[in-house]
Amino acid sequence: MLLLAAVSAAVGLLFRFMIWAAVSPVSMVGAGESAAGGQAEAAVRTERSAAPQEAGLREDGLQPAQRPVIVIDAGHGGMDGGASSAEGVREKDINLAIARCLEAEAAQYPVEVIMTRTDDRGLYTDDARPIRAKKREDLQRRKELMEGETVTLGISIHLNSFPQDASVYGAQVFYPKEARTGTDVSQVCAQSKRYAESIQKRLETNISDGRERSAMAKSDILLFAQVQHPMVLVECGFLSNPDECVRLETPAYQQLLACAIWEGVNEILCLEKNKSVTVIDSANRG
């Protein structure tokens, strides 16, 4: 009798368990889903925690905030042709060609490049105002781009002309002269001078045209007024010199100039080649 009672009790327990299992499948599966879900959630948390370590990095290993910002300004453009040769070669066109070559050189390094223009246009509002007012606006907008908060260096590309003496030739680099009044820009001017001297040296070494020049400080250039960031202006040659004008029109010579300018810049930055780059056209900055 005791054995029969025990068996009966066991059968009853088994029957109750089967009923519980039948009416509560979600409870059992839910336990499994909770465990699996916990693993999945943990995996997601792991990926998300790792993401911030990689999200800001480029293949060059530098975070965006660490990359130097270089503004390349092709002088003149649009209605403003700049200087011209006796044969009608326009400064604005050669400025742009050299600037684009310089952009390509910089693109081989971990920098952010901002171009003030990438085609034949000015940075002014095309309205009925006098030309002088448009030119003033154009220069002011260029200065604003070159004085951006994160800018490391601004490089303005130009050409010279001196019709009174067609024998004058050679590239010349200018940098801001420290103002005697107003904002104290001594440190910025010192940094600008360092870049300018490095570029001037590279131009002489790479071009080897027999012309020796020293980087010069200037205070009468609007771009240099109350300068807040290092800036240089490179006069790449004289359109008034017939021989140099022919060279300046040549793509190979334009590339030579751009290489020399960038090598001078990179002597200061000391960046390794073959890294990432972001190129920004001023027209698409919003």
Stretch-by-stretch model annotation:
Residues 188-217:
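Active-site-adjacent substrate-binding region
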Residues 144-163, 204-205, 209, 218-228:
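Active-site-adjacent loop/helix surface patches within enzyme catalytic domains
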Residues 20-71, 277-286:
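N-terminal, intrinsically disordered, polar/charged segments of Gram-positive cell-envelope systems
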Residues 111-118, 156-158, 207-216, 272-279:
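Surface-exposed patches in mature extracellular/periplasmic domains of secreted proteins
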Residues 163-164, 211-286:
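Active-site-adjacent mobile loop/cap segments within catalytic or ligand-binding domains
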Residues 2-19:
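Hydrophobic membrane-insertion alpha-helices, especially the h-region
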Residues 51-194:
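Catalytic-core regions of hydrolytic enzymes
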Residues 100-111, 147-151, 159, 200-208, ...:
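Sec-exported extracytoplasmic/periplasmic mature domains
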